[in-house]
Regions:
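N-terminal regulatory/sensing modules of transcriptional regulators
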Residues: 1-7, 33, 68-70
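A cross-family signal for key residues in well-ordered alpha-helices
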Residues: 19, 32, 62
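Recognition helix of helix-turn-helix DNA-binding domains
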Residues: 24-59
Length: 70
């Protein structure tokens, strides 16, 4: 499964942020849940989108859902 192999490229923290996006959480919600700044969440989301070749949060959420992580 291509999505699963792509997810292996993510760091643990990137994966946690991606799960939050997949669950429909805002950057502020993810930041509060993971005890990090909103700017850090935004940076993680940008890196995750690039690593997974996703154009936007919706594509990322679909990827996470398809992988059973959201």
């Amino acid at each position: 499964m291509a999505a699963q192999k792509s997810l292996e490229l993510l760091t643990g923290r990137e994966r946690e942020v991606a799960v939050g996006v997949g669950c429909g959480q805002s950057n502020a919600d993810i930041a509060a849940h993971l005890h990090m700044s909103e700017a850090t969440v935004k940076a993680h989301v940008s890196r995750v989108l690039a690593k997974l070749n996703a154009a936007n949060r919706v594509q990322l959420a679909i990827t996470m859902h398809d992988a059973g992580l959201a």
